[in-house]
Amino acid sequence: MESRIASAAFILVVATYIFLGGMGVTDRDNPAPRDAAYNLLARGLLSGHLYLDKAAPAALTGLKDPLDPEANRIAREDPRYRLHDLSYRKGRLYLYFGAAPAVLVFIPWHLLTGGWLPHWGAVVLLCAAGLAANVVLVRSVRSRIFPKSPGWVLGALVLLLGLGSYAPLLAARADMWEVPVAFNYFAVSMALWFFWKAVTQPEKAVRYIAFASCAFGAAFLSRPTVLVNAAILLLLLAPRGVRGRPSAWAAAVFPLAFCGAAAGLYNVLRFGGPFDFGESSQLAGVYVAHLHMFDGSYVWTNLRLYLVQGVDWSWVFPFAHEPAFWRLEGSLPVNHGGIEHVAGALVSAPILWAALAVPFFIRLRRPDRSFLLLSVAAGWVALSSLLLFAFFFGTSSRYQFEFVPGLALLASFGVLA
């Protein structure tokens, strides 16, 4: 019965992802998945080059400064070209995101099926895979730490992890920006599973440390913001039986370092420098190279927006709506880039407050060390991502998906506690 309830909940959540993804905003003005941004990158890679398999239009290449947002506005906003937020350098178009989703998702899909995976399909697939990893993790934690919890609770936790993680919001707007975020969700979920295996099976710790490092490395090749999360690898090296083993340190460092070097080489070949991910070459509505991308003056505003910003209630379905942000724009810090579809996570998903039960459970019941380490790891993943994006110049619901899944995982532990 327990497995049936959990399976039904999982199917319900994935069906929700599919419905929202298929009905949502994706690949605007682009009816053909073959021409979606990540498939353009996949086609380019299959052709032996790093730029998109798409020619830059003469309306762009003929400009004195193609990156000038006023000069490129006509070409950038022309629906025939779909240039917005692509990167441009030396007559070629690039994605400023990493190549991992193209290499590990879009190209294999094409080789196996002969078709081209739409962006929304990739986001749904990755969110479903990430959810599956988290469900397996929570089920293992439950059997080890909370064996007397009722059977139905796993089904409830599937709903918490699947709907309270903000994945539905990502699926509803599954375009090229959401693909690397969904990829990182899956990769970090796998890293946390390998983390748990490493702390519960110390005789196989080196193997699982290497797997966790590989997962973080793959995520870095998709979206470098994940690097702050990878600090949890240090927790795996802390136990006395592990920290003195050179093989454990090598397992933690080498896969991630190799992926970091690969990302640096990828950037050199595209933009001329290992740390240039292409943002300064973006075709955006602003001159991205001139922005104050990270600043301490944004922190408190962004934390308020991400965590406790209220919603507007109405009698119109779905009854809760994002606030009219024109009312808030006057209070934004200088150089702040604006607000995009944000409602406070702790307000819109109040079940996340259950995460507060975890430290009390640890203090009162003193479970084994593995649960303590996993809770710290999940907390660090959530906190480090939240703080990183608190310093960023703009707020967006897709950035919330960088830290809310970690809170949802902790909340599931809190419900069990």
Per-segment meaning from a language model:
Residues 1-417:
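Membrane-proximal envelope and lipid/glycan-remodeling enzymes
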